[in-house]
Structures are given as structure tokens and as C-alpha cells.
Amino acid sequence: MHSHSRRTQACTLLALATALALAGCKKHEEAAAPAAPAAAQQPPAAAPAAVADTDSEFATNAANPDNWGGIGRDFGLNRHSPLAEINRDNVKNLKMSWEMKTDATRGHEGQPLVIGSTMYMVSAYPNNVFAIDLSQEDNGKVLWKYTPQQDERAVAVACCDTVNRGASYADGKLVFGSLSGDVIALDAKTGKEVWKQKLAYPEKGETITMAPIIADGKVVAGISGNEFGVRGRVAAYALADGKQAWSCEATGTDKDICLGPDFNKANPQHGQLGDLGEKTYPDEGWKRGGGAAWGWYSYDPKLKLVYYGTGNPGLWSPSYRCGKTTQKECDTGEYDNKWSMTLFARKIDTGEAVWGYQKTPFDQWDYDGINEPILVDLTIDGKQVPSVVQFDRNGFAYVLDRRDGTLLRANKFVPANWAERIDMKTGRPVKVAAHSPLERGRKVEAFPSAMGGKDQQPCSVDPANSAVFFCGTNNWHMELDPQERGNTMMGLPYVFANVLMKPNEPGALGIVKAFDVVEGKSKWEIKEKFPVWSGTLVTDGGLVFYGTLDGWFRAVDKDTGKKLWETKLPSGIIGNPIAYKANGHQYVAVFSGIGGWIGLPVAAGLDPGDPYGALGAAGLAFSNGFDKIPLGGMVHTFRIDGAGKTVTPTATATAAAGGGSAAVAAKTVR
């Protein structure tokens, strides 16, 4: 690949599939810039819609142990279930209850929702949405199916893979994002569209893969597209009618980013006002500065603050994002590329940023800062502190006071050689120049890789022991070789780096950990041959559930890590397990379907001979047998002594707006 032209190289690095890579290359030859985006779709003029008390409704759903009513079950993304019918003593009798295909065969991240006796779920592209009746034992009856109309250009600019991380529910509405950029609210009973708003524009390199959240009567969502030179953006819409409440950028002026007058008042060392979102980029790089917030969002209903992280700052060849020439000069703070790589706290009513902490200033490794911000109360130095915890891709587990952004802990949870430590006074990492890529053509070995100490796969925590988090982590590093910048037309790959992924330890690509964020050490660890790219689930039955890329779904003792149960699913697991109760039984459910960045070389059929394909994922995949894992796209449910039935997804579905009859809806967008 080193002998390729820059034009071919850019496309090969970000290839989502052979055909899509060719389509991306073809765009380099187009002279015309994309048309300006159309105005967001607005509902017909009507009287102001009543605002539902969604916070109280969500709290009621979460208080019912039978439900999995939110993305992480609760506002804080704890991914903890109080159910205990399935426990250490009887989990050995856990068997398949029923399973169903989703009519999609790309990577299945995310998780279903369960409210009452209904399950809701969203597939990978084409984003089939299902409502399933759970009232019958060992059976899932499809109530309706909806497939949105989409812009197929989104597939070619979806980094990395055409995944979807789920939906949210409140006030009788189910809300999700389509890959081609629509935030869509459906009537949860019928599957009919209530409203649709355009947030992302594929012609500009933008997509939606995240799961919107519903808080304070609003829907909050963000875009993807950092590898295509986008400018990150988060917006909020009224749940009742879809009217936009606010929209804030990740880069640009203080006004663009919605920084409040008291931004970072408690921690001025983290950066305050002064248009740093412009000034810390050379040559107006902020206009393509990345910072897309494509990960997970949490919410504190008492503080009325929403929390999320922003992604990497544009192209991966870092010298273009610094106005100087040496590592020392680029690490002074002058070229931090703010506010990429930042954990933000925003007021839900206005979008005003109360505080922001940039974890990896002047990111040189693609350590996207979008991982889940988990809300817990912790005892820190003898005091009870309302905290936000983030296991960042850069390999550090951060603990901050979620009220004002004060940094309380920052400990390595995986090998991380790019930084010695985090300076707790300034909040800045103490970088190691030898492991910090900068000059074009100089290869650097860095731990962890760009895929992170862990990627977006979410951790779980039991609130009864809120310092210990259960996480699947990545056990490999990378060789990163920055390249010269080529064509930078809007909507084209914006990377310009060669990346190779290398295992830290043969035969142990994944490690599941119980990690104490206060003490900064693991309580136990489990080594897995294949990556652990699923999220984890912890239950009051004393169990932690997780899945592996080669399809093993496992339950272990949460106190010791001892394996208590396992079953093999037909494809790799990159989805997040949930627990719920229906028809008198506790169930555990999870998606299977290999994909995501880790499985993209398999899901998209990339060239086994190009180890740099999919930003280095191809070399890792084909040298470690990922190509032997079958493709898939199913939801699986388990209970004690389940009957093991297969449900036909379109057998009883009814037509839903957006794609014709349910039986053929999936075909209309391909």
C-alpha cells in the first residue's frame, strides 16, 4: 500500500467494502461540490404540542425491574438489572427461548428496549425497526416493522460499518437515527411516523449511528463522520413535534459551541472562553475539525445536564493540525484542537455548555473521546461525590465531579505508552514523544491502538458497589505512519495515515475486567482469544454477561470472574446484552452479527491481502481468523429451561410508513 498514490491510499484506508471503496475513489474525480443541505423537515403548523414529563416517565420505567426502558436501562447508563431469577446457582440451566433474524447482515451494535410486554429494536442498515409482543412464553410475535427511506450514499461514508446503536422511548414514541441522517419519531403502538428531522447529510460525509436519548421532553442526537472531514454537531428536538430546540458545534467560536458565560468556572485550567475552538487549529482547520459525538449520552435529571464525548479532530496526519514542527511545540496548548476529544456537560433546556474537559488535547492517535459517560455516586477521599466515569479510548479511566468537571481520578486501565500519566493539576496528559506520531513518514508504535483500550462497547456497574466497572477491553496496539495530505474535497476520506494493528499477546485479543476506578486497579481479569466487542450487563443474580467476536455468549460470577455458563451464537457478538421480565420469566437478550470497525473487513468483504484496509482492521482480522466467523443479524433471548423457537420476522408484521408493506420494506432501500 505504501506505493499507492495518495488518492488510492485515502480510499483504501477507509474502505467499507470493495465496491464502496471504488465509489469513494470515483468521487475524487468529481469537480462539483455537494449541494447545500436542504432545510430540516418541519411539521405542519399547529398549536404548540403539550410537553410530556419524560423524566418522570423514564424514572418510573427504570424503577420497574422488569423493564429495560433506556439505552443503558437508566439515565446514568449503568447497564445494571435488579432482576435475580437467573443467578449463580441456576444459570447453568439457561437455554434459548426464541430468536429472530433482523433482515440485515452488517454489524449489530446496540441493544433492544423492553417496556411492559413489548420489545423494540433497530437493526444495522437498512435500519429495520421492530416491535415484538413478549406476552407469550418462548415466543416473540412481530407487531409491526418499519424501514426508513434512505439516501444510499450514506453507506459509502459510514465509518466504520453501517451500525446502529439503538432507540429511545418516551410518551408513546420510539425515536432513533437512520444512517442517512434522519432523526425519526415513530408511534410505538403502530410504527407510523410522527415526525422526522434531518440532522446529518451524507453528501457532506455525515451519518447517524448513535442512539438518541430522550430527556426533559427533548431528543438529543449527534452525527458521525470524523474520517470524512465533518464538523461535529449535536442537536436537540422537542419530542412532541420534532421542532429543533438547540444545535451546538464541536469547533468554531464560543457561540457556535454554545459555551456559557461561566464555562469551566471551577476549572479554568481546562480552558474557558476566547474562541479556542477556532484559535487552536491552524489554517482554519476548525472548519473540518471533527469532534463528531457519535457515541453514548447520559443525563442527570436533578442537575438537568446531558453528558457526552466528542470525537477525534479531523485528519489522522497530525502535523497538519499544528502550526509548529516539533512535538514539544505542538504540546504547549496552543494547538489543542478544541473542543474535540472533550467530555461535555450541557444544560438540557438550552444546550449551554457548563463544563468541558479535553482528555486528549491535540489528539495524534485517533483516540475518539466518545465512549459512554457513566453516572454514579462515588466515595472519593472520604467524600460522597456525584461523579461521571469514562473509560476513554486513550486507555485512561477518568472520574470527574459531574457538577463542575473537577478531575478526581485518571488511571490507566490498559497498557498505554503514549502518555506517562495525567497531570491532575492541569488535567493534561504527560505525552511521550517516542510514541507520539507527528512527522509525515515517521512510523510510531503506540499503545493502545486507534481502536482504543476499549471502543464504544459499554461497561456496566452495580450501583451497590459503584467503584467497580465491568468492561470488555482491547489487547492490541498499532503502528501509525502519518502521510502527506491529498485531495480534501467535502465528503471524501479525510485520514491520510497508514495503520497496522498488532496483538499485545498472542491468543488473547480481548480481556474482560472488573476495574476499580477509585483504586485504579483490576479486581479480576478474563483473557479471551477473540476480541470482546460487546457491552457488558451486570445483574442482581450475581452475574456479568458479555459476548465475544467469535460468537460466545458468556455469564461469569461478578465477584470472581469465574465462568458459569456459555453458548455459541451463529455470528460474532458486538451488541449489548440486556435483562428483562415477561410472561413470568426473567430473560437475557443480545444481538449477534459481526461487524463494527473490528469486524468490518469480514462484513464488507475487504481484500485479505491489504493489511492497511479499514484503517488497519483488515490486518488484525485476517491474521487472526475473523474471516472464519459467519455473517449474521439476529436477536437471541434466553431464560431458564427455554424452549428454543425461531420467529419469522415478517410473518405477522403490518405495513409501516417509510417503505411499503412490511414483507418487502427492507428491499426498498437497498
Summary of predicted features, one role per range:
Residues W68-G72, G107-N128, A156-V183, T207-R231, ...:
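Repeat-blade elements of multi-bladed beta-propeller folds
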Residues L186, G191, G232-K243, K328-G351, ...:
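Beta-propeller blade signature
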Residues Q42-M96, L259-Q272, K431-H435, M501-K502, ...:
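Blade/loop signatures of beta-propeller domains
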Residues M100-Q111, K145-S168, K196-A211, C248-W296, ...:
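Extracytoplasmic beta-rich repeat domains
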Residues A221-R233, Y281-P282, Y308-N337, N474-E505, ...:
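Short, conserved, GDST-rich strand-edge loop motifs in beta-rich repeat architectures
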Residues L77, S81-A200, V538-T539:
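N-terminal cofactor/phosphate-binding cores enriched in small/glycine residues
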Residues C25-H28:
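Bacterial signal peptide processing site
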Residues I578-G660:
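Blade-level signature of beta-propeller repeat domains, shared across WD40, Kelch, NHL, RCC1
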